[in-house]
């Protein structure tokens, strides 16, 4: 379907009955309104959520999540402004910068397919939620261009990683990060889960068989090639070499994906996420989940050696720290596999971590180039989104629905 033809379907989908209610009460026990809304900054004709105010750094994934929260709070105009801000940084080929520092995206493209998919997904929710809104044409254009980029970067039905590779240089002055221009050929399972739900949503709002077929092909390839029977979860990556890393998102989000395609392995993936990554943070007494089950903290041996003296543990299985964003993903997996009370309990266990503005921290421990303990847009938004799902009940899902 050509771009102009797809844009023409706006008039046809204006009457779509959405899955996201237009007006809802606060979606969390904690009022995060000040933090979420306070992160928005003017950008072009719209707004973007600033990830790191001190560094003036923006991440499009964070902005997409804030747009989803705004839709659930009944703040449709604010969600539309965020989509306008995201459209302002979208390239002609549909790519979006994973993150960038003001005043604008870097000259070297740093694109991650998962972030592109989340932006597209937020745009489709805007279209699906209500028939009105000033940014319908913009939202459809944003989503279609994002899909065009992703579908142009497929191998065997799966999307590849994106563009720009992070390189680290270690010398006497410390560690320096740079981005090397390149097209990434590796296949991230997480990115493909993101893309699946985006394409399914876009197929629904545009009534396009092409998007539905692309999503079906992706699901078939991912469920077949991505599953690790020996680990009870989806792998982190798919390629010629077996990926040894056990990543939480590929267990938790993997469970949500498998549940959506009615694959019985969803329950096993949830159990893996729940137990293999479980941790208690001794500094706060909070229980939750860590991002990786085992392996070195840094995969780059130079970074591992440089920071080994300052790390409390050399490996993830011995690191006692909680990742709120990831824990919320486990809660969603619990909900989608029939463990409603456990889903609620996982989120309740995170509440003591609330910081200024009732934000969740990124992590409960600082790890250079990986995690910090600053207020997290993504972590805060994920907790709110999953609380909203729990409040509605398992029979009325809104996030990542089939």
Question: Where are the predicted features?
Answer:
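Helix-terminus loop motifs that line ligand-binding clefts
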Residues: 76-119, 349-367
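Bacterial N-terminal signal peptides
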Residues: 7-16
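Alpha-helical support elements that line or immediately flank enzyme active sites
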Residues: 63-79, 83-86, 251-252, 258, ...
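Bacterial N-terminal signal peptides that target proteins for export
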Residues: 1-7
């Amino acid at each position: 379907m050509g771009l102009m033809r797809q844009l023409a379907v706006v008039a046809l989908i204006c009457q779509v009955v959405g899955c996201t209610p237009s007006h809802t009460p606060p979606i969390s026990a904690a009022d995060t309104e000040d933090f979420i809304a306070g992160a928005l900054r003017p950008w072009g004709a719209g707004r973007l959520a600033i990830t790191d105010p001190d560094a003036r750094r923006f991440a499009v994934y964070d902005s997409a999540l804030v747009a989803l929260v705004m839709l659930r709070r009944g703040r449709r105009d604010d969600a539309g402004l965020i989509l306008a801000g995201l459209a302002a940084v979208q390239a002609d080929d549909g790519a979006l910068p994973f993150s960038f520092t003001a005043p604008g995206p870097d000259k070297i493209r740093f694109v991650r397919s998962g972030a592109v998919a989340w932006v597209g997904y937020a745009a489709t929710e805007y279209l699906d939620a209500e028939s009105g809104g000033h940014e319908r044409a913009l939202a459809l254009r944003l989503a279609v261009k994002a899909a065009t980029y992703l579908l142009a970067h497929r191998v065997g039905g799966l999307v590849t990683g994106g563009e720009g590779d992070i390189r680290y240089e270690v010398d006497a002055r410390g560690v320096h990060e740079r981005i090397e221009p390149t097209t990434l050929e590796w296949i991230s399972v997480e990115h493909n889960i993101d893309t699946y739900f985006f394409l399914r949503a876009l197929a629904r709002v545009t009534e396009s068989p092409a998007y539905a077929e692309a999503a079906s092909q992706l699901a078939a390839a991912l469920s077949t090639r991505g599953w690790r029977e020996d680990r009870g979860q989806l792998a982190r990556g798919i390629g010629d070499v077996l990926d040894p890393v056990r990543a939480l998102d590929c267990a938790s989000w993997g469970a949500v994906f498998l549940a959506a395609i009615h694959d019985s392995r969803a329950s096993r993936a949830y159990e893996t996420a729940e137990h293999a990554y479980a941790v208690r943070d001794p500094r706060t007494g909070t229980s939750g989940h860590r991002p990786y089950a085992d392996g070195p903290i840094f995969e780059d041996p130079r970074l591992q050696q440089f920071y080994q003296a300052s790390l409390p543990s050399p490996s993830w299985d011995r690191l006692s720290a909680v990742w709120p964003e990831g824990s919320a993903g486990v809660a969603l997996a619990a909900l989608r596999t029939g463990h409603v009370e456990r889903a609620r309990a996982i989120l309740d266990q995170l509440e003591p971590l609330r910081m200024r503005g009732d934000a969740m921290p990124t992590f409960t421990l600082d790890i250079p180039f990986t995690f910090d303990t600053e207020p997290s847009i993504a972590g805060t938004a994920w907790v709110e989104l999953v609380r909203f799902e729990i409040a509605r009940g398992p029979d009325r899902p809104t996030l990542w629905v089939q």
